[in-house]
Amino acid sequence: MVAPSETQIVQAVKAKLESGLTSTSDVVREDEVRRLLATLELEHDWQDIAVKKFISILCKHSLMPVSKPNDGCTSRSTSCPGGKKKKKSKTDTSIPKSFIDPTISFPAGIRGVYFDPVKGKGLVATRSFSKGDLLFTEDAYIPTPPPEAFDQMASGQLCAQCFLPISSAPVALAIKNCSKCKHRFCTTACYKTAMATHHTLLCTGINASAKPLIELIERQKWQSLHCVARSLARLLMTLTRQYHGQANKKADTQDSVATYGDFETVYARLSSFATVSELERRSRNPGWTTEKASFESILVEAHTALCNALDPYSSTRNANLEPFHVSADYLDSTRKPLIKDLFCLATFMKLVGRANINMEKFGGLYSLHSFLNHSCSPNLEIRHVPERAILSSMKVAAIALCDIHPDDELVISYIDPNTSLARRQLLLYRDYCFGPCTCDKCTTQLGALGLVYDPAKHAVKAFLDSVAHKTRPDPDHTLPPTSQDSTLEDQLRASLGF
């Protein structure tokens, strides 16, 4: 993580004001300070900055109006009437952080909203939708194959970009084979996209240093690690000569920058996904104490393999292997610290956590889909869009489950909403690092148990323990565990992405 200078903070705030992220273009309003700070911390991976210091810098540089003395607390002081002091604000690392990437285009009738640092971002309807309406379709920003498809993709049976069967290719002559490995692509479009966003850096025939990483992913069927690798490859591809058309002067050379974005655009998009350390997720697993040592060991192995494969500054890169494709011409002084930080172990833990809490159930990171918050009474469902009479694993559609009105938040269910209250709360807490869920359904069921969640009074884990205790069966009438109960631990481990 980076400790920003005052100049860096000022420059970043001015850039946000100019981009229209705030409601005014010249100053930051008091009610926008915390949201802006959370956004900048995540986007630039800054160390936690006290709100007091942030406000002081904004006021000093006339980026925020100074509060009047009779407003209670001034922006330059933590002193309040009665001699009390405000508690220093620090970001809770157990809560996933996200922000809205201003380059995202929202479909008609939908807007993106940043609610607060805890809930993060979401989607809200700006017009009415009827039950069954299609609200949007979306292709994966980072396509990642389902674990069961790894072997078929590696052997060339499935397209390495869209993961549809090669045999279903619309035109046999359009099938493209990688000349350096067994990966195949079902169309010219899939081939061009893959080469521009990941395959050039992850192909073991082109980048021999990537072989241990790919072997680890395939051996462990480690989907979240594969997602991290493809995410970083997409970012680093923006720093290659091929990406900028310098390696191929043909007239039909694809303008990759215009199609897929430059370094800053891709970095901002990836950073905007909700992010939390994988260690935070793992620590909520009931078997964490037992598996901690072995898991941390394989994480270090994965981190080492990732750095050897993709880190432009890795000291362990084999100089005798084919030259790395990232060009020093594009590694300027601004990008260098960002890239170095991306490959440190702590950031790697965050990248794995980001992949696990954002990937759609079949894999892949989706820009709009990642905005959707959870409710046990969802008004949307996500379906996969058929292509060539086959359900495409990397294209989704959002369908209204009921009538939706203007200003309604668009929500999906991350889990099976028909399971018990205690089980839903448990899975959401462990898999998605939030809770307790207080949607209408949960609030009603909690109320029936005499429970009302108050964040000012209740610690999350203690409250969830109360829910479990209240819903526990009478010990005098306990039945033998069902197959569903006995596999809960297995399901939890699977849902943790490893």
From Swiss-Prot:
Catalytic reaction list = L-lysyl-[histone] + S-adenosyl-L-methionine = N(6)-methyl-L-lysyl-[histone] + S-adenosyl-L-homocysteine + H(+)
Q: Which UniProt keywords apply?
A: Chromosome, Cytoplasm, Methyltransferase, Nucleus, S-adenosyl-L-methionine, Transferase
Keyword Transferase included in the entry's annotation:
yes
Q: What is its main location?
A: nucleus
**Where found in the cell?**
Nucleus; Chromosome; Cytoplasm
Q: What is its EC number?
A: 2.1.1.-
Q: Which GO terms are recorded in the biological process aspect for this UniProt protein? A: methylation; negative regulation of gene expression, epigenetic
Q: Name one GO cellular component term.
A: cytoplasm
Report the top EC class in one word. transferase
**Transmembrane helix as UniProt keyword:** no
Q: Where is the SET domain?
A: 108-415
Q: Where is this region: Disordered?
A: 68-94
A Pfam match is SET
Q: Name one GO molecular function term.
A: histone H4K20 methyltransferase activity
Q: Describe its function.
A: Histone methyltransferase that monomethylates 'Lys-5', 'Lys-8' and 'Lys-12' of histone H4 (H4K5me1, H4K8me1 and H4K12me1, respectively), thereby controlling gene expression and remodeling chromatin structures.
Family (UniProt): Belongs to the class V-like SAM-binding methyltransferase superfamily. Histone-lysine methyltransferase family. SET5 subfamily.
Please report the name of this protein according to its UniProt entry.
Histone-lysine N-methyltransferase SET5
Organism this protein belongs to: Mycosarcoma maydis
Lineage, highest ranks first: Eukaryota, Fungi, Dikarya, Basidiomycota, Ustilaginomycotina
